[in-house]
Structure formats: structure tokens, C-alpha cells
């Protein structure tokens, strides 16, 4: 099994999202000891945003880099995405990655019956820290967007691990992280006993 681990938080060692995504990957390693993990830090090694030049792919090095991103995605069976909520949505570095994998003829196609995803059969686990509380979905453009774009690519096995309200106070941050990690542990226990 191949697992692609992406982090997109700009907070480095202070990132709750990075702690959560690492915990999800570790959980997958325990469940599947043979897993082959690839890691990409979209903050430290950002993918260029789409421009007229990157779309034209006139630079052979740029075209090769874009193809490497695509192949890494296509070869993954499981994708763990560290996606913090920034201003109600996702980091622009993660959006740049999505723009490189959402390619007509590669991960989706247009048919007489409408668009059809070509990247099905993958499992995506999204680890996310949010500064506030988003029980009211009208302010959450992150989760619906990720579900929509991944679904458009044919991926329907999508789950979220969330720590909310991490900006409220240090205690709330610690409690939210502990709760999210405990939820992972409960999920793991359920999987083992099933």
C-alpha cells in the first residue's frame, strides 16, 4: 500500500494540523506495517501557483515537476492531507497542489452525461485544525470544497479529523488536540475489534 502524506500548515512545529496528520500516518503504519509513505511539505517546498506560464508548460523542468506531483497522487492508495483552515478555506499552497492534480483527461473527464472522476479507489483522510468553532457550516468553505473537488476526481472515501477552537486559549488548544487524538484512538480500537 502506498500512502501520500501532505502537510500545508505554515506554522511548522507550532502546527496542530501537523501533529494530527502525523498521528493519522502513524495510525496507518500500525494498521499496515508494509505501507510505503511518501511525504511532501507544501509550505517548505511549495508548488508554483498556476499562471499563464505554468499552464503552457513551456519550461521542461516545470512540466517534469508537475508530472511528478501527478504521479505521486495517482500512485497513492491512501492520502493524508494536513489542511488547516485559513480564513474559512484551505492554504493557497494546498490549492496549488490541487490545481496540479485536477487535470482533465488524467483525473477526470467530461462525458455526454457530465464530468466523471478517474481517480476513484483512493482513501483520503484530512487532518485539520481550526482557530474557531464551525458547527454552523455557513462559515466553513474548507470541508465542502475538499469534499467537492475530491469527489469530482472520483474519490468518495473521505474522512476528517478536526481540532476546533485552537485559537481560543492554550487550554482549549490542548483540549481540542487531545480530543481529536482520542478520536483517532477510538477509531483504531474499533477497526481492530471489527
Swiss-Prot record:
Q: Where does FMN bind?
A: 9, 85-88
Catalytic activity reads: 2 a quinone + NADH + H(+) = 2 a 1,4-benzosemiquinone + NAD(+); N,N-dimethyl-1,4-phenylenediamine + anthranilate + 2 NAD(+) = 2-(4-dimethylaminophenyl)diazenylbenzoate + 2 NADH + 2 H(+)
* Co-factor: note: Binds 1 FMN per subunit.
Single GO molecular-function term? Answer: electron transfer activity
What keywords were assigned to this record?
Flavoprotein, FMN, NAD, Oxidoreductase
Query: Does NAD show up as a keyword for this record?
Result: yes
What Pfam families does the database record attribute to this sequence? Flavodoxin_2
Q: Cofactors per UniProt?
A: FMN
Q: What is its EC number?
A: 1.6.5.-, 1.7.1.17
**Which family, according to the similarity comment?**
Belongs to the azoreductase type 1 family.
Q: Provide the assembly information.
A: Homodimer.
Protein function: Quinone reductase that provides resistance to thiol-specific stress caused by electrophilic quinones. Also exhibits azoreductase activity. Catalyzes the reductive cleavage of the azo bond in aromatic azo compounds to the corresponding amines.
Protein's recorded name: FMN-dependent NADH:quinone oxidoreductase 1
What does the record give as the organism's lineage? Bacteria, Pseudomonadati, Pseudomonadota, Gammaproteobacteria, Lysobacterales
Q: Which gene encodes it?
A: azoR1
Amino acid at each position: 500500500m502506498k500512502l501520500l502524506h501532505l502537510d500545508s500548515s505554515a506554522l511548522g512545529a507550532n502546527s496542530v494540523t501537523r501533529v494530527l496528520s502525523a498521528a493519522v500516518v502513524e495510525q496507518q503504519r500500525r494498521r499496515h506495517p508494509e505501507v510505503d509513505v511518501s511525504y511532501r511539505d507544501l509550505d517548505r517546498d511549495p508548488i508554483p501557483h498556476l499562471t499563464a506560464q505554468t499552464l503552457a508548460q513551456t519550461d521542461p523542468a516545470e512540466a517534469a515537476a508537475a508530472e511528478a506531483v501527478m504521479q505521486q497522487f495517482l500512485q497513492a492508495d491512501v492520502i493524508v492531507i494536513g489542511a488547516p483552515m485559513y480564513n474559512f478555506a484551505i492554504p493557497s499552497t494546498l490549492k496549488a497542489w490541487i490545481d496540479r492534480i485536477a487535470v482533465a483527461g488524467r483525473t477526470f473527464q467530461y462525458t455526454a452525461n457530465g464530468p466523471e472522476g478517474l481517480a476513484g479507489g483512493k482513501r483520503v483522510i484530512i487532518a485539520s485544525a481550526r482557530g474557531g468553532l464551525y458547527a454552523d457550516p455557513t462559515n466553513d468553505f474548507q470541508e465542502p470544497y475538499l469534499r467537492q473537488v475530491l469527489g469530482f476526481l472520483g474519490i468518495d472515501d473521505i474522512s476528517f479529523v478536526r481540532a476546533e477552537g485552537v485559537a481560543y486559549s492554550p487550554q482549549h488548544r490542548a483540549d481540542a488536540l487531545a480530543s481529536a487524538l482520542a478520536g483517532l484512538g477510538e477509531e483504531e480500537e474499533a477497526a481492530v475489534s471489527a
